[in-house]
């Protein structure tokens, strides 16, 4: 308790319905992309819980690809992970991304400008102060680093951007 729980599927083909303790928590359509569902509010702490994943790999005209030069295998064919985070965390809910994107705005042999865009989320009703820190490394050497302290409103999500010029 006091943590957030996410199920991250790396691949299930082609329509996956996920149930926690017999309650439907979501559907994912598409066989080749990762997807995440938050299950925090569905878990019975201190008791046995069940996870059921029903996957349909029958032909679906609205789910790509429809044809290919490979076999269309069904079911869960890649790893599934249980992610456990603090209530305020880097969110995995943006299309199952790791929650951090690096954007190279300008790069040359002498100069680089890089933006780090971080998806933050607070799963608590109360606002929380968090510290966001990023270090850019060249091998073992720290090239640049930044830290920011910010307040996340209760049950809120935001994107925070840090810019590095090196």
What are these regions (language model features)?
Residues 1-93, 97-98, 123-124, 141:
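Accessory beta-strand-rich segments of carbohydrate-active enzymes
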Residues 9, 39, 55, 104, ...:
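Hydrophobic residues in beta-strands and at strand termini
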Residues 20, 110-151, 158-162:
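Beta-strand-rich binding/interaction modules
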Residues 31, 83, 149-150, 164:
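A generic structural motif
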Residues 33-37, 156-164:
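Short strand-edge motifs at loop-to-beta-strand transitions and within beta-strands
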Residues 67, 152-154:
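Charge-dense, low-complexity intrinsically disordered segments
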Residues 101-112:
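Short, solvent-exposed loop/linker segments at the N-terminal edge
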């Amino acid at each position: 308790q006091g943590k957030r729980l996410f199920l991250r599927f790396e691949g299930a083909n082609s329509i996956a319905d996920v149930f926690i303790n017999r309650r439907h928590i979501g559907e994912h359509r598409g066989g080749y992309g990762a997807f995440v569902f938050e299950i925090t509010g569905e878990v019975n702490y201190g008791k046995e819980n069940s996870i059921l994943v029903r996957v349909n790999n029958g032909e679906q005209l609205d789910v790509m690809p429809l044809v290919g030069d490979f076999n269309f295998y069904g079911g869960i064919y890649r790893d599934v992970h249980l992610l456990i985070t603090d209530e305020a965390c880097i969110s995995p809910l943006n299309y199952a991304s790791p929650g951090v994107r690096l954007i190279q705005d300008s790069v040359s042999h002498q100069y680089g400008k890089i933006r780090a865009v971080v998806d933050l989320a607070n799963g608590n009703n109360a606002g929380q102060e968090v510290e966001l820190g990023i270090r850019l490394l060249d091998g073992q050497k720290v090239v640049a680093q930044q830290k920011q302290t910010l307040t996340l409103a209760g049950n809120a999500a935001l994107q925070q951007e840090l810019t590095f010029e090196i």
